[in-house]
Structures are given as structure tokens and as C-alpha cells.
Amino acid sequence: MGAASGRRGPGLLLPLPLLLLLPPQPALALDPGLQPGNFSADEAGAQLFAQSYNSSAEQVLFQSVAASWAHDTNITAENARRQEEAALLSQEFAEAWGQKAKELYEPIWQNFTDPQLRRIIGAVRTLGSANLPLAKRQQYNALLSNMSRIYSTAKVCLPNKTATCWSLDPDLTNILASSRSYAMLLFAWEGWHNAAGIPLKPLYEDFTALSNEAYKQDGFTDTGAYWRSWYNSPTFEDDLEHLYQQLEPLYLNLHAFVRRALHRRYGDRYINLRGPIPAHLLGDMWAQSWENIYDMVVPFPDKPNLDVTSTMLQQGWNATHMFRVAEEFFTSLELSPMPPEFWEGSMLEKPADGREVVCHASAWDFYNRKDFRIKQCTRVTMDQLSTVHHEMGHIQYYLQYKDLPVSLRRGANPGFHEAIGDVLALSVSTPEHLHKIGLLDRVTNDTESDINYLLKMALEKIAFLPFGYLVDQWRWGVFSGRTPPSRYNFDWWYLRTKYQGICPPVTRNETHFDAGAKFHVPNVTPYIRYFVSFVLQFQFHEALCKEAGYEGPLHQCDIYRSTKAGAKLRKVLQAGSSRPWQEVLKDMVGLDALDAQPLLKYFQPVTQWLQEQNQQNGEVLGWPEYQWHPPLPDNYPEGIDLVTDEAEASKFVEEYDRTSQVVWNEYAEANWNYNTNITTETSKILLQKNMQIANHTLKYGTQARKFDVNQLQNTTIKRIIKKVQDLERAALPAQELEEYNKILLDMETTYSVATVCHPNGSCLQLEPDLTNVMATSRKYEDLLWAWEGWRDKAGRAILQFYPKYVELINQAARLNGYVDAGDSWRSMYETPSLEQDLERLFQELQPLYLNLHAYVRRALHRHYGAQHINLEGPIPAHLLGNMWAQTWSNIYDLVVPFPSAPSMDTTEAMLKQGWTPRRMFKEADDFFTSLGLLPVPPEFWNKSMLEKPTDGREVVCHASAWDFYNGKDFRIKQCTTVNLEDLVVAHHEMGHIQYFMQYKDLPVALREGANPGFHEAIGDVLALSVSTPKHLHSLNLLSSEGGSDEHDINFLMKMALDKIAFIPFSYLVDQWRWRVFDGSITKENYNQEWWSLRLKYQGLCPPVPRTQGDFDPGAKFHIPSSVPYIRYFVSFIIQFQFHEALCQAAGHTGPLHKCDIYQSKEAGQRLATAMKLGFSRPWPEAMQLITGQPNMSASAMLSYFKPLLDWLRTENELHGEKLGWPQYNWTPNSARSEGPLPDSGRVSFLGLDLDAQQARVGQWLLLFLGIALLVATLGLSQRLFSIRHRSLHRHSHGPQFGSEVELRHS
């Protein structure tokens, strides 16, 4: 964009400090024939002076322009030297003739009668840089040369690479125009502004000082005053401001509309609808024209595409053809064709021979009246077709005024020169003209097509106005001193935000020089000419259309082939700068001033449309939040080459889904075969399938990581790719992956085949043998034998594997971008505040647990006596009816509040009635279908393992539900026992199956619960209904529905032993693992810290001393199987929220614990709607569908158990129970052995066998805990009162909850 006559080019490829140390270019002696002669000091002498000057100037200017051309089309040190020689010669010539003009005519030239002569002498007497002494002149030339060189040779290289580097044109220009990747655009933008701008700042400071020094000697206050003098108007600045104010409303409406479109594309993170637009998103390096993002903002996308770039390419257009088409437009107006020298000498494409060139498009006048050229790295695009006409406009101007004196071979003002080609481009870009030249199939002139066209033009013309206005506002401030070097960048961005409403996309400071990243600043080309030209061209267009006889909307006018219009234009061009521009303009348009009305008239239809659209959308015009800046993208700049193409992403997701169904099905089959028949062969096959699925995960995860998910718009595709990007264990190198898989298999196998043997040789497995012992025995020593034996066999054996497992799972997590494995597991909840939220929920439920704990401890004290139970201490962990003391329902007979009330144990009735495991699952299936949910398919009954095999096979008995990823095969594996507890478990597992069936049509990656807790909660929600006396009565398992207060308390106690007792255990398991993963628990302290947490949260202690050789966490299935556990805590909370919401949907009234949703289609529909979502939406949305609000809350659980809490509080107060365990360091064997162990030098402390130093540290730690517990206990009664008080006045928001039969996810 710009005429280039007499412009300075780049120079030596040396840094400025080094360049300034080189010897200056020697001053060349001016040929005596070019020196001024003797002339009389009057007007007649001045006429002779001007004629002599003209003939000499043509020679000097030809040499100077030829040297600049040679350099700009081949940037070498030699060409830079020759260019500087020519510059010095030009300056010496200017000095000689300028000084002579001042000497002869200074007092009288403004009084000459010939106005053209006055203009010539006035131009000659202005020496500019020739005023400087030789040394400063040489420094000035070197500065110009170096600034141009830095700009023209700047490159942006990919991070950590040198092979791929981009130049501005065409590389970075193409990226800014075509990329829709936020990060890639940012990298290109930031890279260019740093590479081109930063090195220029010190040079620009020195240039400013020298330039001002030179022009002050010509009588100007500074360089800016000289530049403004070309417009010969004392009110020039005020006139421009008035014009801008007239045009600003149109810009503001365009800005708001485009900002909304960018918001649709980039979202809230990167676009603030009340703030400025990040500068790199508008399709252009300087956000000066926005037509490259037309595809993102097109008002009516179904209308014909007005960007004809693709058609040009299809038709084989090249650069030369584009210039021939432009020439033909000019000649159709009977203007001049290009001379032969134009076609012979121009550089119309970027050279392919490796030369460094100045790509910025420019038109050149060689001042010999025949040689005119264009230098442009032309690309075949519609945008460049407009640029071609623009540059041809300059050439046409040169051709028309070539016979004027050299000093008058300029535009009437600089804006005139820029406007001519653009006037023709206004015709060329009309759909009618594009149709005429074969680039549009048809012309559609309906309103919608008009709006499309005008918006496209507005993106070029209106978007440019504030930038065209502000560049020289900034430079005038620099030249005047209002903007010192210490504020170059601050003031630049102040103006860009003030006028353009854009902001830098990355932090900028005064080390940056972002103005220097725009060609015209380092190349010292004034810019206000473009603002002027954008107003003038519409005045010209209106006048020429009228001359051509056109009637109709101004934006549809095409002056092609109008010789009348051509004649009118020719008259303007031929005048050059021989007359005041106001006169030339008046001859052309009938008005002698710049006028915005033709521009406003041209855009009036789209102005009105934009106003209506913005009002409908409630847009804020302007940017009141002007200080807002966007955040940096994640993984910037490493992630800049990520793919953002939606179609490519969609194709990838389809392929991933198709292949995943096959691979996951094969893996599930192998895993099932191993779990139902543990042999060397099945484990070998499973390891193979493990590697196969890891390879699949690695392959597609690696491909997925090539996508920038933040830039994708389709939320489903975005969610899938983000999930697939997490390679999990497959991120490990092959050898480590193989080791990891083997460790997992070894740990799980060790756990599954472990047995505990009596001295007589009979051995018991966990399921069902040891489980039965723990559930039914009331003998302290028998329970201790089973408890300790299981941990000796399972836990200790797993310890050898666990440290390496931790190392490898952490390594995998870090390779996936997480801090550690705990961070990875927590990410599944998509909740930054997860840990704080869970702690809050636990604190809300703790009073209920403490009261249950105290009550149960009293009952155990009655049974086992003071030797084994301390009423102020923790409970021995083996006495609670379960191997891990996680649920206490098996000791219901010891704690039943009202033993004389009717029994709720249905086991006897089930056995009498001949219930089988299959019948239990049939009843569960019936419950789901009664809600209008799906029945299980035939494959379920044919392939599930519902009982422990009797053929001697080793199996994994832990109950689990399985999805085989083919949409029809779903199974349960459970060593079912006919009792009420396993009936509840059957409903839990069937809940997983129902979830699988509901989301089976989703892509594989989304076939999961909304969060892991959701999957656990679904079956438990139904189990809450199944467990009610009412429902059990309907199954003929209870003789009555109950209904008395005593019956209710018994029922709630039984439920609390399941649900409330489980809360602290489900909370602490992953508290321990997260700390193991983050390193705060080391392998030396695995067991000690495990028991610290079990004491802190559960109020339990080991019944026998534990050592660090023990590994009691490993005696819990989920630890060796690497299954996250916090999901169960979550599920126990949310199942009560679901239950409350579904009871409301079913129309239930009355206490929540009596609700049975059986046969409620309304409840089923609400549940199905949420399950169908799978993992396709964030879990709060699924929560909203079920409960009407998006948060986890303990209120429903508290509401459910409120009658029991009231009863427990009364009972505990009656017996003077101490809530908590203030004697926290008591253990069952402490009366016998608290202190040094015989002959060992070791200490039994807190049930642990420790050395003395460890025990001392532990005592201090527990002293602190004791004080904290004491404070907590003192405040408890007030807390209980507060909870009770709130429950009477607060509407329940609905909770969630579930029974712990943990899902074994493949």
C-alpha cells in the first residue's frame, strides 16, 4: 500500500552499533553539470532556475530510485552500499539547489505571480535531511537503511526449532488470514511484533532526533509539522477529527457485531463482550482490515460466496493476469496502458531464487517519464486483486502527470495518490463486475446478498478507518515530544484501544516497540494519507458514477468502460500537485473539502442492518471494560501447531470411535475371562490385550494431542478429544508400560488368590469364607485371627509391588500433564474446588457419624467388655462386622435399638422361599422396568457370573458390572449369597448395567457416568427404595410394613450402619493415596499414615500392633487394583439427593426414609434423561436434570437420617457418652503392652510396633490431635443444636447416596 517514488530502502545486514562504528560512506562529489548555475534574483530568474533544476533533478532522482529498487529487490550489503551512495548524492544535490533557492528567492518567492513557480520553489527550498551536516547525514541514511533491513528480513521461528522460520510475506500474512487457531495466531502475532519491533526502538529514537533537527532548519516545529504541511490547511487536524467523529458510529456497530461473532468462535475465555478485541484475531497482522475473517461473520452464509479467491485459483489466474485485468479496467476508461518498461522491469511475484526482498507492495516512478514499476509479492486472492488495482492507480497517476516539472509530480495531496486505484477497486469488487470478468456465476441483488457484500466491504473500508487515523496521531506525538521513548509502546496501545477497541493479546511493555512492526513506521512513510484516501475515494466514486450516468445504490455502481468517467478522472490525475488540492477536488466532486457523506451513503443499508442486529443481541457499543486483556492459552507456545479444523476433528473422532469399539470389546472379553478363571494362560492373554489397548490408546491419544481442543466449537467433539488426549498408562515408554501392567496384574492376582490357613491346614478365602467370619462371628479372637491373617497374607504380599506402582503411575500422570496421579484422578470431576467441597460435605456429616460411633461403641462395650472396648477411645477395627470396618450392618444384632420390634432381616425368608442369585437379579431388573427403564438383554442372563463357580476355578469375587462396548453385551460378576445385603448389592450392580444401556448409543469415549460417583449412585438409589419395609413387604419378605417409631428407628439404624458408617472410610482411602502420590507419605510411613487417617476419620485402631512391614491398605481391593475410591464417598452423598428428587417426582409425601419409587414412570423418566447424557456434559448439568440444581449437598442425607440423629443424641446424652475418641492412643493391647516390647528396644504405640524415636514423634503429633479433638468435642453440642435448628427452617436441596459395592471398571 503506497507510492514509492524517492523512498528509502533497507541497508547493510549489520546491527546498528556495529554499523555506526564503520567508517562513513565517503561523500561523492556532485557532477559540475548538476550544480546550480547563476540566476537573477527575480521571478524571471526563478523560472530559469526551475527549468534547470528540473532537468538535473530527473537525472539524480533516476539514480536514487534505481539504487533503491536494486536494493529492495535484492537485499545485499553491496546494494545497500550503493543505495547509501545514491542517497548521499541526492542529499548533496538537494542541499546545493535548496541553499541556492534560499539565497536567491527567500525574501520574494511567496510573492511570485506564477502559482506553479511558487510551488516549485517552495519544494526545492525544503532541504529536509540535506540540512544535516555530512556526519549526521550519513548516520541518518544508515538509520533508514538499517530500519528497513530489520523490518524486511525479520523472521519468526517455531519454538525450539530453527528449521522452520516464517517471513512476513507470504508466511505470517497467510497464517493471520487463514488460521483460526488462537494459539497459532498469537504466536505469529507475538513473534512478528518481537522480531520486527524490538530491535527498531533505539534506531527510531535516533531517527526522530535527526529528522526533527533537519526539518526545524526548514522552519517547521518538527517532522510531523512538515508532513502536515503537504495538506496546506491550517485546520487539517481539526478537520480529520471531525471526519472521524462522523464515521465512528458505523465503526462501533461493526466492532460490536464482529466481536459477537468472534465470541461465538473463541468463547468467553478470549472474547469479552464489553471489552476490546484481542488484536491477533481479525485476519490481519495489524487488525487494519478484517476481510479475511469474512467467513466467520458473514450475515447470510447461504447466499453466493463473494470471496472469489477459489474461483481465481480454479481458473488458473496468476500474478501477471491479475495486473493485465487491472490494466484493462484503466484502458476501458480510455486511460493509459502500461508502457513496455512496466512489464519488463516490475517484480510482480516473490522471487523463487532465494533473494531477500522487500515484499511490501509499492509503485515506483523512475522520473524519466517512461519507466514505472510495481514491486509486489502477489498472491492469487481477491484481496490481492484489490491491491493490484490500488498499485496500478499509482502508476496511472505517474503516467498522467509525467510531463509536469519534477517538483509537481505528486498527488494533489498524498491522499489523492492512495485513492485513485481504490476508486477503481470499488467497481471491481461489485458482484456485477466480478460476473463480467468471469469470477461470479450469477449476480444476486436481493437484500441479503447486498448486506453480505456491504459487510465484506465494511470489513475492508470501515475497519481500517481508526487505524488509518491513529498511526500518525502516534507519530505526531513522537515527533512533538508528547510521546517520549519511555512511553512509545504505552501510547501506541492507548491509541489502538481508544480508536480501534483492540488490545494486545499478550503483555507488552516498553522493551517492545509494536509500532515498529508496521511497515510505514521503520520505512518512514506518512500514514494519514490512507485515512484521507478512504474518505476521498468515496467522494470520487460518487462523482464518477454520476458522470457515468449511473443511477441506483452507490455500492452497486461499476464505472467499467465509462469514457466519461475516465475523462473526469484524467483531469484530476494530470494536475498532479500543480494546483491546490481543494481546487482539484472541487473540479472533480463540486466540493472543496473532505466529506464523509458519500462513504456513509454507500454503507447506509449495512449501517441500519448492523444497528438492528446489535440492538436485538443487546450489544454494548464500545468497550467499557477497556482494561481487560485475554489470558494466555494453555501450553503456549508449545501448542501452536495444534489442529483446529472442525472437519478433521470430526473425522478423527469417528475413526477413534469405530476402532475403540473393537479394541475395547476384545479387552473386556480377555479381562472377563481372567476375572472368571484366574490362570497363567488367561493372565497372559489379558496382558497381551492390555498392551493392545495401550497401543490403541497411545496411537489415538497421540493423534488427539495434535488438536487444540480450546479452539474446537463442537462441544461433543471437543469433549471426546480432550478425553482421548489423556493417554493414562499408555503414555509410559514401552518397557515401563509392560512393567506397570505386570505389577497391576501381580497385585490383583495376589489379592484375589490370597488365603488364610488354620494350623490344621484348612484355608479360607476372602469370599465368602473370611467375609462370613467377619460378618457372623462374635468371638473376639476368631475375628482377630481372620482380620490379622488377611492382612498378613494379602497386605504384606502387595507391599513389595506398591512403591514401584506409585512411581510408574505418577510418571504416567506427569506425561499426561498432571502434577501426579492424584491430580489425574481428581480431574475426572472437572471441579477445581473438589477437595474443599468434599471436606465441607464431610464436616456436615461428621456429627451424625460421631453419634453413631459413640452408640455402637457402647453396644460393643456391652458385648466385649472393658478389656476390649474403651468408651473414650477408638474402636478395634475387627469388631464391626466387616473386614475393613467400612460398613457395620453385620453387627446390627448387637446394636439394634429395639430388639422386641419386628425383625427386618429378610435372609431367613429369602432362604425359606427358595430365592436364588438369579431370582435376586430378576427382582432388580423388575424394579428398573417398573420405572419405565430398560430390561437387561438376553446376553446378560446367558453370560453373567451371578454365583461363585463350584468347579474349582479361581475367580475375582469382588462384585462388578461390565460393559462390552458392542451395545448389547452387559454382564455382572458377583459371588452372590442369598441375603438382604447381597440383594442390595444386586440392585447396585444392576444400576451400572442400566447406566451402560442408557448411554450405549453415545461415542465410546462418552460411555461413562457424568462423574465416577454418578455411576456408583444409580443402583443405590433404587436400593434405598428396595430396603424400605414397605417394599420388602411387597416382595413377601417381611410380614408387615412396620410403621411404628421403634420400627422406624430400627430401620434407620440398619441403614446408618451401611451408609453413615461408610462415610469416613470412603473419604480417607483416597486422602491416603493422594498423599502417597504427592510424596507427603513415603513408603517408610505407608502403614503408620494409613492408621493415622483411620483413627482421625473413623475413630478406629488396629487390634494388634502393626509394623512398617505390614501394608494394611493393600488388604483393600481398590488399592492393589488401582481403582479410585472417592467416587464412593461422592456416590453416598448424591444418591440421597437423587432419592429425594425422585421421591418428589413420584409424588411421595412423608418422611424421606419411607419413600419407595417402585413403578413411578415419572421418577424413571427423570433418571433416564440424566443417564442418557453419559459423560457428554459436565456432571452439574446431569445433577440439574435430576435434582433441579447443580451442586452436591449433604442436606438430603441429613434429612433422611434426622429421626435417627435425634434419637441417637438423646441416647448418648442419657448414657453420658463422649463423642469422639479423646483417649486416641488407647489400643486393645495397651493395658498389657503399652511401652517397650520385651527385649526389642521397640515400643507399641497406637497399635504400631515402632522404635522409641518414632513413638516420641507420634506422641507429640497425637497430643496436638488430642487438643484439637477436645476443642471439637466441646463445640459439638452447639454444632448439633445448630444443625437441628437449621433443619427445622431450611428447605432441603436434595442429596445423593449409595451402598458400597464398588464398580470394577475395566
UniProtKB/Swiss-Prot annotation:
Chloride 3 binds at Y829, R1127. One of its GO terms (cellular component) is plasma membrane. Changing R1166Q: Does not prevent cleavage and secretion of the soluble form, suggesting that processing can take place at different sites. Keywords: Calmodulin-binding, Carboxypeptidase, Cell membrane, Cytoplasm, Disulfide bond, Glycoprotein, Hydrolase, Membrane, Metal-binding, Metalloprotease, Phosphoprotein, Protease, Repeat, Secreted, Signal, Transmembrane, Transmembrane helix, Zinc. It is found in: Cell membrane; Cytoplasm. GO terms for molecular function: actin binding; bradykinin receptor binding; calmodulin binding; chloride ion binding; endopeptidase activity; exopeptidase activity; metallocarboxypeptidase activity; metallodipeptidase activity. Ubiquitously expressed, with highest levels in lung, kidney, heart, gastrointestinal system and prostate. The chain crosses the membrane at residues 1257-1277. Disulfide bonds join C157-C165, C359-C377, C545-C557, C757-C763, C957-C975, C1143-C1155. Residues 1-29 form the signal peptide. Residues 40-624, 643-1222 form the Peptidase M2 domain. The keyword Disulfide bond applies. The modification Phosphoserine is found at S1299. GO terms for biological process: amyloid-beta metabolic process; angiotensin maturation; angiotensin-activated signaling pathway; antigen processing and presentation of peptide antigen via MHC class I; arachidonate secretion; blood vessel diameter maintenance; blood vessel remodeling; bradykinin catabolic process. It catalyses: Release of a C-terminal dipeptide, oligopeptide-|-Xaa-Yaa, when Xaa is not Pro, and Yaa is neither Asp nor Glu. Thus, conversion of angiotensin I to angiotensin II, with increase in vasoconstrictor activity, but no action on angiotensin II; angiotensin I + H2O = L-histidyl-L-leucine + angiotensin II; bradykinin + H2O = L-Phe-L-Arg + bradykinin(1-7); substance P + H2O = substance P(1-9) + L-Leu-L-Met-NH2. Inhibitors of ACE are commonly used to treat hypertension and some types of renal and cardiac dysfunction. This is Angiotensin-converting enzyme. The lineage of its organism: Eukaryota, Metazoa, Chordata, Craniata, Vertebrata. The gene is ACE.
